[in-house]
Amino acid sequence: MKTTIRNTFARAASVSAVTVAALAATQPASAQQIIGLTTTNALITFDAATPQNGSPLSFISGLEGVNQRILAIDTRPTNGLLYGVSTDSKLYTLNAATGAATKVANLATALNGTAFGFDFNPVADTNGVASLRIVSNTGQNLAVNANTGGVNVQAALKSGGNPIGAAGAAYKDNDANPATNSVGLYVIDSASDGLYFTGAPGAGMLSFVGSLGWNTTGVIGFDIAGVNNAAFAGLTIDGTDTGKSGLYSINLTSGMASLIGEFGIGGNTAISPPLLGLTVAAVPEPESYALMLAGLLGLGFVARRRLPR
C-alpha cells in the first residue's frame, strides 16, 4: 500500500507537470482574452478570435454617487488587476466576472472630454511612478498615480502643430518585464479616423501613422497585447444601419483597421451593445508556468522522500 501511494503521488506529479508544460507551450498561440466595457456600463469577456461569442454582461456595481458610469478600462501590468475611471473622475478596480467596483482614489484633476484613452505605461508602472495615461477627445493629457490619484497635467495633444483629440490609447510592449517593455504610445482619433504615435507621451506631440480606413464614431476601445503587440480596437462605424460595433485588428505600421467580427453574446450579435472600452486580459507570464512546473516536480520528489518504504 505504501509503495502504491508513493507511486501514485509520483505519477500524479508527472502527469500534472506534462499538462503544465503543454499549457505553457500552447498559451502564446491561443487567441487573447479581451474584456470589453459596454455603453450600458457593463463588462463582457470574449476571445479575440470570436468576438460574437461574448459572455453574459456583468453590470458594474459599487460606484460612488448617483448615475455614475465607467468611461474606460485597462489591465495594470504589475498586478494584473482591471482598472476603470468614472464620469466623476474616480479610479476603481473592477471584477470582470461580477462587475463589482472597488474605489482606489479620487483623481486630483477632473476629466475633460466625452471619449477617453486609458492605458498603463508599462515602464513607469514597473518603476513605481505615475503610470496611468489618460487622454481625451479634447486633447487632455494626464499622467496619473494609480495608487493615490495624483495627477501630472501634461502638454495637450498635437500633431503637426495642430490640436488633436484621442478616443483610444494603448502602449506597445505592455508587460511587467523591464527588459522588453517601452513607452511607445499609440492613440486613435475618431475625428480624423487616424492612428497616431508618440515615443514621449508627456510632450503631447503625435506623429500620424495612417488612416483606419473607416469612418468611426467616438465610441472606441483600443488596446495592445503585451505578449505579441497584437493591436485590437472596438470600433463603431458611422453611417451603418445597425450602429453596432465590432472587433478590429489594427496594423500598427499602416494604421489600417481590419474587421475580425461583430460583438455578440453567446453567438447572438443582435443583443450586444457597442463597446466604449476594451483591454486584453492578463495572462500568466512564462515564469508562472515555470514555478507551477517546479512545484509539481517538487511534490513528486517530496512524496518519494517522505513516504516510508
Predicted feature residues:
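C-terminal membrane-anchoring or membrane-association module
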Residues: 301-309
